Amino acid sequence: MSNENHEELNDQLIVRREKVDTLREEGIDPFGEKFIRSISPEEIETKFADKSKEDLEEAAIEVSVAGRIMTKRVKGKVGFTHIQDRFHQLQIYIRKDAIGEDAYAIFKLADLGDIIGIKGTIFRTNTGELSVKATEFTLLSKSLRPLPDKYHGLKDVEQRYRQRYLDLITNEESQNRFVMRSKILKYTRDYMDNQGFLEVETPVLHTIAGGAAAKPFITHHNALDMELYLRIALELHLKRLIVGGMDKVYEIGRVFRNEGTSTRHNPEFTMLESYAAYEDYEDVMDLVEGLVSTVCKQVNGTTKITYGEYDVDLTPNWRRIHMADAVKEYVGVDFWNVTSDEEAHELAKKHDVAVTEHMTYGHILNEFFETYVEEKLIQPTFVYGHPVEISPLAKKNKEDERFTDRFELFIVGREHANAFSELNDPIDQRERFEAQMKEREQGNDEAHGMDADFLEALEYGLPPTGGLGIGIDRLVMLLTDAPSIRDILLFPTMKHRD
């Protein structure tokens, strides 16, 4: 911003504050009281769209409306303004002799961005525009700062994220996207409820960071003098509830991971996790397919959508493929016939797949998949059969114990869900926790810790269970064609300004 523009902005701020002082000197509160609205600009548009000028004159319908001033022009004793409420604008016609000299003086002091209340009658102008002829004018809130770019929106993308309130005032697409987010959450809950799941709440503060491979945020409880972790997953507490006999449960809540940010990652984000007793990962595939396709149809009116450059068909009967088969199909490497960790390391070197010393067969297969396959899965695809090394909470596959009964859902090259037949053998679970702790000692700081209380719960008996995790934010991105996770979080995490 140039010095001249900076001074101009300061001048505007000063003038608006001077107007506040002027109003107060006249005994007028610039930040008014409750105002009862009888109708919104949107309702006027829809209810009276087919009414003629003569119809409205004869009916003389009195209304009470409120909104933010977006345009204003005054000529002598007559003025026009457009007020906005949720991106529906309504023209207000104001005459000095109709609202009185004092009220008209206040109107003349009004600036773009001020919030006003109007009482009057609906009419149609000679050009056919639905309007309200004011009989009363009330200032409800004085705007001390001018709206950006003459209310045409914020040009600076980062400013949109930092000052979301301005983005919502000036960007209809952004506001609509957040309305859709709320609907997606509602329809998701409706679907889960209709499938017989019970919504529950579990702790945000954990004594052990478990349920996912991620770095936690650490805090300290002063009274108990103990370290606690903001949860990185919902899983382990929900599975305790299955042990307790709550057969089908789900939770939608915030989780926290002390990791980097990107167009797909925010340190705090919203997860849906669900667990159903006596089911397996194939049942969960059916649940996910039904949930995503149903919610998509409810918010978009169709299961065929566009995301960026891709046309995506979410109609059920999605593709299902084993991870080893996917690597064989897309890369030409057959991991079914790899018999040792050494052979896997040689393949990684040959195909330029980055690996570390502690990685074994399963880690390397997964690295091949993430390097060469994941981004190619545009249409909804369930990839199942994840290696046991990267799935410490999933049940081993009976036919080949190198793999687990686990799947991830990929759409437009991104993971959208993670699910498995839950490991319910407490002895096997303890061994896997121990293996994870060895990985941590070897430098994998995202490996799971030992959760003794969870192991004790498993020892009382966890029935066969199908578990699911869906990233709500990525689902919202997909269904609203949002390029960045910051576009669908009202207040994304941002680095401090210098």
UniProtKB/Swiss-Prot annotation:
EC code(s) of this entry: 6.1.1.6
Transmembrane segments: none
InterPro entries per the UniProt record, alphabetical: Aa-tRNA-synt_II, aa-tRNA-synth_II, aa-tRNA-synth_II/BPL/LPL, Lys-tRNA-ligase_II, Lys-tRNA-ligase_II_bac/euk, Lys-tRNA-ligase_II_N, Lys-tRNA-synth_II_C, NA-bd_OB-fold
GO cellular component: cytosol
GO molecular function, a single term: catalytic activity, acting on a protein
Binding site residues for Mg(2+) 2: E415
Protein localization: Cytoplasm
Full protein name: Lysine--tRNA ligase
Gene that specifies this protein: lysS
